[in-house]
Amino acid sequence: MKLNKRSILFAAVILLITTLIQCGVYVTDYYRADRDAIVAFQQHQTVTKQVLSDNTIAYVPHDAKQGIIFYPGGKVDTAAYEPLASSLSEQNIAVFLVEMPFHLAVLDADAADGIQDQYPEISSWYMAGHSLGGTMAAYYLEEHHESFEGLILLASYSTYDLSQTQLNVLSIAGSEDQVLSWDQYENNKIN
């Protein structure tokens, strides 16, 4: 009986260690930004990048009246979205890229909290996100839709019913996207 308990305990410890190693490998294996692309866009950007906190990068033009809070896709480096943020800021739109724990927006869906309060001069706010980030942006809007004009989804969909809100929704997906679950995308269009 004693041997059996030891064997079970040993197996449980091995299983726990294996699981922890697999989790560590999973969260450290993510899509990184192309450094050459980052360098190329930095040479031409006109709006200065600001680091607001440990988890938020901002591109805020001087007279911006519109702001976008952007949640990155699952396991995608936040820096990969900096060229997009810089381009939008050149159109006089403030963009806030929120870095997520372990590159997973599901771990901090409320990361947008407090950003709007820091910029009272911005009158129109939008949430945006790519892939998992878009789904979590929609989740955030389920509770905070009164303070936003709309939602922008890039290769994403809302699993939360926002149809009874006044939000404008823009959904963009590439026809050759082989990562997006097209069945889920179609099934959730109603939301």
Region spans (language model):
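Conserved alpha/beta-hydrolase
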Residues: 85-105
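Gly/Ala-rich beta-loop-alpha elbow adjacent to hydrolase catalytic centers
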Residues: 128-137
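A conserved short beta-strand
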Residues: 147-158, 168
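Short beta-strand/loop motif that positions the catalytic acidic residue
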Residues: 165, 171-173
